[in-house]
Amino acid sequence: MVSRKAVAALLVVHVAAMLASQTEAFVPIFTYGELQRMQEKERNKGQKKSLSVWQRSGEEGPVDPAEPIREEENEMIKLTAPLEIGMRMNSRQLEKYPATLEGLLSEMLPQHAAK
């Protein structure tokens, strides 16, 4: 037999999941401080990369980071699977944004018909 505490915990988790699926509010994944730290890491990574480009150029002096290096010229990113973007909306959301949805559909339908 299952204990009452386990049933109560599962019930609380279920109710929280139902509320989370019905809410339209934005819940931030990262705090503001975490975002700042991640942006700082990205800036530092970019500075390190530009330094390594300069070191690879040898005695030629600083290289413009916008110029591709011979090794990087031949690199190409290829998608291995088709990419599809979609969204789910419940009936309340559909009733709330009819004009926007009509505009999006009118833009997308001619594009698909042309293909």
From Swiss-Prot:
It comes from Homo sapiens. It is found in: Secreted. Belongs to the motilin family. One of its GO terms (molecular function) is hormone activity. Residues 39-72 are annotated as: Disordered. This is Promotilin. Residues 1-25 form the signal peptide. The keyword Secreted applies. The keyword Secreted applies. Keywords: Cleavage on pair of basic residues, Hormone, Secreted, Signal. It holds the Pfam family Motilin_ghrelin. Its main location: secreted. GO terms for cellular component: extracellular region. Plays an important role in the regulation of interdigestive gastrointestinal motility and indirectly causes rhythmic contraction of duodenal and colonic smooth muscle. It comes from the Eukaryota. InterPro entries: Motilin_assoc, Motilin_ghrelin, Promotilin.
